[in-house]
Every structure is written in C-alpha cells, then in structure tokens.
Amino acid sequence: MVCPNGYDPGGRHLLLFIIILAAWEAGRGQLHYSVPEEAKHGNFVGRIAQDLGLELAELVPRLFRVVCKFRGDLLEVNLQNGILFVNSRIDREELCGRSAECSIHLEVIVERPLQVFHVDVEVKDINDNPPVFPATQRNLFIAESRPLDSRFPLEGASDADIGENALLTYRLSPNEYFFLDVPTSNQQVKPLGLVLRKLLDREETPELHLLLTATDGGKPELTGTVQLLITVLDNNDNAPVFDRTLYTVKLPENVSIGTLVIHPNASDLDEGLNGDIIYSFSSDVSPDIKSKFHMDPLSGAITVIGHMDFEESRAHKIPVEAVDKGFPPLAGHCTVLVEVVDVNDNAPQLTLTSLSLPIPEDAQPGTVITLISVFDRDFGVNGQVTCSLTPHVPFKLVSTFKNYYSLVLDRALDRESVSAYELVVTARDGGSPSLWATASVSVEVADVNDNAPAFAQPEYTVFVKENNPPGCHIFTVSAGDADAQKNALVSYSLVERRVGERALSSYISVHAESGKVYVLQPLDHEELELLQFQVSARDAGVPPLGSNVTLQVFVLDENDNAPALLAPRVGGTGGAVRELVPRSVGAGHVVAKVRAVDADSGYNAWLSYELQPVAAGASIPFRVGLYTGEISTTRALDETDAPRHRLLVLVKDHGEPSLTATATVLVSLVESGQAPKASSRASLGIAGPETELVDVNVYLIIAICAVSSLLVLTLLLYTALRCSAPSSEGACSLIKPTLVCSSAVGSWSFSQQRRQRVCSGEGPPKTDLMAFSPSLPQGPSSTDNPRQPNPDWRYSASLRAGMHSSVHLEEAGILRAGPGGPDQQWPTVSSATPEPEAGEVSPPVGAGVNSNSWTFKYGPGNPKQSGPGELPDKFIIPGSPAIISIRQEPANSQIDKSDFITFGKKEETKKKKKKKKGNKTQEKKEKGNSTTDNSDQ
C-alpha cells in the first residue's frame, strides 16, 4: 500500500497496537466507573452485570453480591437489571479527604463457579464546600513606622474540595493603604499577605477595617470572608525576622518522644524589650499540631511530644511566629514542614469472607472453602504481603488477585479418618524486619445423609382406657439415626389415613420433636376397640430419609353404660309389665321375663337380677332368675295370697362401680273362671279393681295353636336333619351355622360356630351349649381393620329365642380368644352333681361356690390347635378377669329350664352372606326354638 507524503502505515498500526496493549494490561481484571459526590439515591453508575459478561438470569442463582471493605452501603446492584446505583450519600471529603484521587473499590463475587471481579468507582468532586477562614475576624497590629512594601502574612482560607473547586482567588476591600499579595502556583507554601503601599499615620488613621474575600474556582462560585481589624501602633518599628520563611524536616514515623525536630532562628533589629523575641506556634495552628509538637518559647526549639503515624498523615505544616517584647509587640513568621517517613510498623491484616463450611466429605477437589484478603497499611515494600498455609493438609491457597487468595480443596476428604481440620493462614510482609499475622480456619467435614432413622421394634401395642381425658399422653416413640448433625435430627409425624368417616388426625396427635403420642378426644370402647396407625420418623437431611412404626392402641372398656331395659310386651302401660296368673299354677311357673342389655363388655356387661324387698316382714310367692331375669313362682298359689303384687326387679351389672336399672312387673292373681271376666271388664273400661286386666283368652288360644303347630313342624324337621347328618363322630355331630350370641361383650356376629355335644358313657346327653368365638382384637399380624359397632339393634332368631324362652343345653362348646390372646379354659361340669338352679352363672372364683359346682379352671388347656373351620377349644370374655361358668340343673328339677345368661351387646345389622347350607338349617332351628319359647310364656 502506498501512502502520500511518504507516510508509513505499518508504523502507525504498530504504535496503535502498543497503546491498546498497554491500556489492556493496566486495566485487566477491573472495571472503572465514575460518579459525582452527593449523588442522590438511585443514581445510575453503570451496567455492571453487562460489563462483566454476566447474564441477568444467573445473578440470583449464582449469589451475585458486591462487597466493599470500608463502606459497603454506598453502592448497590439491582439484581433485576444488573445496574450499579448509588445507595446512600457519598461525601468525597469524608471518604478521601484532600487526596487527589478518590475511588471506591468493590469486590463482585459470584458462585457456581466462584469468581471475583474488581471494580473501581471514581468519586468526582463537586463544588459543595465554600472557602473557610480559620476565624471570622483577624486582628493585626502594625506599627506606624513600618516602611512601604512591608508584608503582613495572613492565614488563607481552606476549601475541602479538590482541583479547580479548591483553587482560591482572594480580593481585598478597596483601601489606600494595603494591597493583597497572593503567592503564585509555585509558591504554595508561601502564606497570603497584606503589603503596605502607603505609610501609616496613627494620628490620621488609628484603625482600618478591611474585608478579605476568598472565591473558589467551582461553578457556581462559592466564597468565604474574614474581617481584618488593623490597629496602627506607634514606635516599635522592627519586627523579628526568621532566617528562612520555610524549613523542611524529615522524621521517621517511629521517632521517639522528645526528639528535636528543628531550631528555627529569628532576629530583631530593635534593642531592649523591642528586640527580645518569644517563639510560639501561630494562633491558628491546629490542635493536632499542638498534640504532636512543642516549641520552646525562649530558644524556639521544636520537639516531638506525640505519636507520629505515616498512615494517618504524611506531612505536618507548622506555622511559627516570633514576637518581640516591644509595645506594641511585633512578630515575624515562618513555616516548618515536617515530612513523615514510613517504617514497617504495621503487621498485615487478614480477612476471611464467604466461608463455605462445613464441607461435605464427598466434595470434589478444587472446591472453594473461603476467600482470604490481606491488607497492610504500610507503604512500598513494607506493604507487600505473601500468604502461606499449614503444611500436610488437603487444602491449598490460590492467588486470585493482588492481596486476594482462595482456600480450595486439594484432594479428597475422608470424614471417618479426620472429621475436622484446624488450618493456619500466615501473611508476611516484605519489610525488614518482616511482620506477620495469622488467621485460623476450622474446617469441619460434614457427613452425608446415608442412614435412615430406625425404631427399636417394628410395632408397639398400647392399652388405653376409654373415656380418657382429651390430650392424654399414651406413648412415646423414639427412633435413632446413625448420622451426625442435622442428618440425625429426627422429627415425627402421623401417617394420615381414614378411620371410618373421620381422619386419623382427629383422634391421634404426635409431637414432632419428642415423639409423644397424644389422644385428642375421649375414646369409646363401644365404638372403637382397636386403633391401628403408623408414625413416621424422618431426619432433616437432604434428601430426607425416614421409616415407619406401627402402633396398635387397644381401647379398654370401663363401666360407663347402665343396663337398659328392653321395651315391655304389648299390654304394659306406664313402663310396667302387667301379667295375669291363675291361682292354680304350681311352683316354678314362669310369670314373666325381664329383658335388659348393657353396651359395655366383660364383667361390665354381665347382668344379674334380683327382687327388691317389699314391705317389712311380707313374703311373696315369686322369685327371679339371678342371671335370666325370669320371674317364676316359688310355690303353689293359694287363697291366702294377695290378688295383686307389685314386683320391683333390680338389674345391675358387675362393673366397678356397679350400675343398675329397675323394672316394674304388676302381677294379678285370678281364678281360672274369672280371668276372662276380669279381662272383659278391663277391656270395656268398667270401674273396679279388675278394670286393668286384659282379656287374653282369644289370643292365648290362637297362640297355643300356632305354637303347637310350629313346634310339631320344628321337631319333625329337627329329627330329619339329625338323622340325615353324618355319624362319623358317634353321638356327637358338628353343625356350622352363622349365629348371633348375646354375651358379656354384647351381641356378637360370627362366621363360624360349632355345636358340640357333651357325651357321657352312662346315658344320652342332657344339655346343649351354644358356643361362639367372640370378635376379639386380632394380634399384630392381623391386617383386618377393627370392626365398628352397629347402632342398629335387631335380634336374630337365636337371640329372640334366648330372650323369650328357655334354652335346653344339649350340647357343650368351648370358646377361645383371638390369636395371641390369654388362654382361659371353660369350666367343666360333673353330671352327677345336682344344682339348686338351672342355667345360672356362678360368681367369680373365690366367691364361695361349692366344690361340686362348675368352677373356673386356669391352665394351658389342650395344646391342640384348631384347624380351619373347627371350633376353638378356649373362651375368654374381653375385659373380664375371669371366665363365667354355667351350672347345669338336675334333671328332676321342677323349676323351668329356660334360665339363660343375658348379656348386653348390640347385634350388627348387616351379616355376611351365608356360606353353607348348615347355616340356613341352624336359622330354621332357631326359629323353632323361638316359637317354643313363646309358647312357654
């Protein structure tokens, strides 16, 4: 390429490249912005994110932050747009004083990966400070004998700004005696002064009032003024004069107290007192000078009396004056400039920031642990700092910028070998002798969450009495975690599920920290016998690990339900049962039967009946079955018996305390021929004592015929079924119908039942016993939910038969508790022993029953396990401490054999589908028994 005028383009390009390279080397790794001082909050400084090459979307995820070592609140970054803006007032004079350069150094730190950028924000000076004189008024005493061009120094004004804003110009108010002498730029040390241009005449002008104004170079201009009061003196014409107007001295900053700085000398041409000189600091000297230096008034020697610090002030300007003893006194002035020389007297300072502790043991080499910055207040070589780390540790220091280091992981960690490291970082400067400082870093190796909380056993069983107070503490679960710190911090919670129509959390609460299990509301054994749920234990690790434990809460029964009387049969009014009894009946005739139920279980539902005594000394020919509730005659009735009897039957359970109910039975004795008549009058409402009798002849005849017919059909059907049954067991046969039994735990519904005949070698069997398996809570291995009680009361055929008529015990059966339940053996009977009453239940063991009666027997019983479909060989009433026994009556007893235990549970309204044909057969037989019972009544 040919250029005109012989210009070489290659040299131009080379020069441009050198300039660009030098600029790049000077500013590598930094951004530079500028902002004027006193900028308002929110003023734009620069697009720092864009200039650093960072995307706005990664500022928050990478934890973008700005760190300032001294004043961190002056500038902020908007993480939404990446703009650096002014956050608070910036005062350049407060921040940097009179330094020519003033900048704020920022450290921009981002993580993932960790990066550090350095940004310098230059603070531009504005003209916000006016010139200020040391005093608002200055008094000058000038002898009238002073010659022309005499110079009188003045203390100039000071301006806190810099540059052109601090360039001051002075002007003096118009006068004929003085003009203002302003030093040039190369005479900055020379003070401002007044120059006499006309001889003074005290007699003509004894005083002068002048105004000195200082104006800075800023825009707009700011000014400051001082009043000059000049007093013209007579006689003493010569003032002291120093050898030099400026003395310069250099002192090390560690100079000792009492060291002589300089001995300035002044002379006075006058004689006598007018020539005697007294040295002192000028009146406008700063307090800082007075605290560091002392001047002898006679010799003028200046000595050190305070500590000197190069880092605080690098030079001290001392104004000195020499005053003679004339009247008025005259003064001469000079300036002593003390330059402070730096020495290595400051140890390095270490600062740790952004600690990433503790560090997981699976951290990768190169992971940054912390950022370390070092700073030394000394200058030059004394301020150059190098850092080192404790040897033989899996960490190292990496220099990221001048005086900035990163502590990073050098190799893999093993928490099982070393769980923590104590590191020492040493910073050493380049002075002589060298100074150093250390900082300790405790690096803890964190465990990873690899162990789930574990319970001591997979499930627990808890027993709680019903009617517990709300908020009752029933159990405490505890799980251990082999991890450390938060990975071993276990919290507990309830595994929510539905319990019927309600949430499990409405019943149970688990304390998250202690694992205490609380029952939130009173429990009812009649509604809920077993509550099975799970408690979850979860640690605080990331990700969290957990495990569950199963709690089985059995609700124990309490005697909180009184016996409830069943509704009387038709014909009773006013809550009383009315019965007509012919006088011709004999002993043992059943007059009526009181029926009651109890919603509790076990002994709390075991009911007994007794007659309340009437008038004192009176006897009645009636008795009530202790456990059947049947009212029967104790002897044959005769004419001496009263025609009407009011019987009060007390029904009570065996709970603690016992609860009772009372039934009223009105018995009227009538002649066989008078019964229809009395009943007729009663039905017509005729007045008289027989008006309350009911005419039942017609109904009685119809009932007898119907019952007789049903009885014959039932017997025929029963005989046919017995003959057709398999005879594999000899005289004993098995039938498996589905029945409902009223027992000490209420009305039970069972899917399997076995009727087993008690066989004797001496003769045919005398009694049958209906035996059932109660619906007890299953063991821990069971997965079935507890059965809820059914509020619908309906009685099966077998239950109605037990209520309305006698049940002849022809077969004996054995009941067993659920799997895992306590073994209690049904009492045995001696068929050769006569008993006073048929079908009565003996009291608990130890109540005084003779040795020939049925008694309780405890022991392991027959160890043989029942197979599927077979009848269990043991029986227990839940909630009872012992088994009740039924005593067999003698065959020749005249008392009706219809006594039967009346338990109080409600029957479930919905039954399972009938599984076998024998179930239907058993129901038919129960209907036949019910019909027979009705005929007996």
Curated annotation (Swiss-Prot):
Biased composition (Basic and acidic residues): 896-910
Membrane topology value: Single-pass type I membrane protein
Extracellular-side positions: 30-697
GO terms for MF: calcium ion binding; identical protein binding
Signal peptide (UniProt feature, chain positions): 1-29
Pfam families the UniProt entry points to: Cadherin, Cadherin_2, Cadherin_tail
Limits of the Cadherin domain: 30-133, 134-242, 243-350, 351-455, 456-565, 581-678
CDD domains for this protein: Cadherin_repeat
Compartment(s) of residence: Cell membrane
Keywords: Calcium, Cell adhesion, Cell membrane, Disulfide bond, Glycoprotein, Membrane, Metal-binding, Repeat, Signal, Transmembrane, Transmembrane helix
Matching InterPro entries: Cadherin-like_dom (IPR002126), Cadherin-like_sf (IPR015919), Cadherin_CBD (IPR031904), Cadherin_CS (IPR020894), Cadherin_N (IPR013164), Protocadherin/Cadherin-CA (IPR050174)
Disulfide feature: C96-C102
Region spans: 5 X 4 AA repeats of P-X-X-P: 774-881
A single GO cellular-component term on record: plasma membrane
GO BP of this protein: cell adhesion; cell-cell recognition; homophilic cell adhesion via plasma membrane adhesion molecules; nervous system development
Record field: transmembrane: 698-718
Topological domains annotated Cytoplasmic: 719-937
Biological role stated in the UniProt entry: Calcium-dependent cell-adhesion protein involved in cells self-recognition and non-self discrimination. Thereby, it is involved in the establishment and maintenance of specific neuronal connections in the brain.
Subunit structure: Forms homodimers in trans (molecules expressed by two different cells). Forms promiscuous heterodimers in cis (at the plasma membrane of the same cell) with other protocadherins.
Protein name in UniProt: Protocadherin alpha-7
Protein source organism: Pan troglodytes (Chimpanzee)
Lineage: Eukaryota, Metazoa, Chordata, Craniata, Vertebrata
